[in-house]
Amino acid sequence: MNKLISACAGAGKTPRIVSEAIQAIDKGERILIITYTINNQKEIYEKYKSLGGNDYKNFKVKGLFTFLLEDIIRPYQNVIFKERIESLIFNERDPHKIGNRTIFGRKEILDNGETNPLHFLTQNGNKAHSTYLSKLAKRIITKTKNAPIKRLEYIYNKLYFDEVQDLVGWDYEIIDAISKSKKISLTCVGDFRQTIYQTAITTKKPLSTIEKKQFYIDKNFEMEDISLCRRSILEICELSDTVHSNMGFSPTTSNVKVNDPNIMNHIGAFAVKDSDVNNYITRFNPVLLRSKVTSGKKYAIESLQKFTYGKAKGLGFDRVLILPTKEYISFLCGERDVFNDQKTESSKNKLYVALTRARYSVAIIYPDVIPKNCPLKIWTPE
């Protein structure tokens, strides 16, 4: 049975899947965990070691692009391209476009019916475009009648796709192909509220959270929700839940208890007036989260740890101070439709990520005249 584990922020999904992997290895099984970011790969290996894992022959972790190249494309690429694809080039934009103009000669199929190398590869032919890597992998799976999937069946018993919220479009064709295997147990893990990055520039669905969740329903994946947070106190969980309150996620609960008097004197979610920010920083020494690395320089932030919203993903801190965008202020003051006209869910998801980094207190900087409908406690210097 294939499974989707949808885990809230701070749920401990990495310990969960690594513990499962160790148990499976003890039974003689071979495990591959696939994830998107390098930081996540390191975190998984570190957790494996800390939990007592030591069988690195049967426990493997790969980045998504490495997996696609090594396990699907290269072993069978000669059905489409004869020259070895050495590596990939990471695309921050569509490699077939300059601005809104499509570059001539990049269509997938040439007039003679053959595959156009320039659709998938750089001009020298030895590097693949990252944004079309899953599409190329799917073409090879189809052309070889599932040969890469059969090869995977000989190598691994269990596959985990971690951070599946970052996958889009053609990536889901790969998941679909693997899910049809009768010999591989496939588990996908993620939190769709934390979709900040995505693996490709594409218009191919699924793209949105709703579309991605529907994919797993349509493919008959077993669904498991983990809504118990092991990082943040309940008040912070409840505030972060409001960001996606209309999207069908289970309410987040918390098992975090606070007994330290030095922590208990300031817990929860707070609004801090602009003119009080430096006093707040001096008192609590929070970690600053902001939209850009250049933001917030008018405050006394030199000694603080500082992260952009995206770079803070996966991290946790005792106390967090958020320098919000105007949209975040509006949302937190009750304008729940402020994100509706945006093309992607990235901005909304970054707010969720920022709020859920905090263990005990999260403070948001407001103008000195705080709107009357602000639901947060207002912090004032003693």
Placement of each model-derived feature along the sequence:
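The feature marks helicase ATPase cores and/or their adjacent C-terminal helical subdomains
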Residues: M1-E382
